[in-house]
Swiss-Prot record:
It comes from Xylella fastidiosa (strain 9a5c). The keyword Cytoplasm applies. Mg(2+) 1 binds at D8, D141. GO terms for cellular component: cytoplasm; Holliday junction resolvase complex. Mg(2+) 2 binds at E69. This is Crossover junction endodeoxyribonuclease RuvC. Pfam families: RuvC (PF02075).
Length: 173
């Protein structure tokens, strides 16, 4: 059984999701939540809150691997920089515990979970709920984090069957 932590980074809210994947590639939901970072008066305070929150999740759930969504380019440079900083803090929380980090673009995640790279938030929320047998509507940041973890589970299973790295399993040569 492999435990995977998925992270959907954000400067105001970061989604986290934990799944277990058995030797047959079947995923089971363990935990999900948004880490809400708006209670701090400064951006540095939010980054600290993110580091502490992710550290607590890693400590409690002991993932063996971590998957994180790659940053996308925003029209707003300030937003893109803040997102990049939040992502850097998230990666730091992971590598400080010597865990492997796997990165996936939003389009890759949508393709892996919904089957269409242009899927919208509601489609992702629905498919994550179906795949993990969850009842009710998922909060979007947490659903995105679970989608990242599911994507990594699928890519890892494919890579293992092919005897290649996860990067090679995803590339289209």
């Amino acid at each position: 059984m492999t435990r995977i932590l998925g992270i959907d980074p954000g400067s105001q809210r970061t989604g986290v999701g934990v799944i277990d994947v058995d030797e047959y590639g079947c995923s089971r939901h363990v935990y999900h939540a948004p880490l809400v970072l708006l209670g701090q008066s400064s951006f540095a305070g939010r980054l600290k809150q993110l580091l502490l929150g992710l550290s607590a999740v890693i400590e409690e759930y002991s993932p063996k691997e971590v998957a994180i969504e790659k940053v996308f380019m925003s029209k707003n440079a300030d937003s893109a920089l803040k997102l990049g900083q939040a992502r850097g803090v998230a990666i730091s929380a992971v590598v400080l515990r010597d865990l492997p980090v796997h990165e996936y673009a939003a389009r890759q995640i949508k393709l892996a979970v919904v089957g269409r790279g242009g899927a919208d938030k509601q489609q992702i929320q629905h498919m994550v709920g179906v795949m993990l047998n969850l009842q009710g509507r998922l909060q979007s940041d947490a659903a995105d984090a679970l989608a990242v973890a599911i994507t990594h589970a699928h890519v890892s299973a494919t890579a293992q069957r092919l005897g290649v790295s996860t990067k090679q399993a995803w590339s289209r040569k």
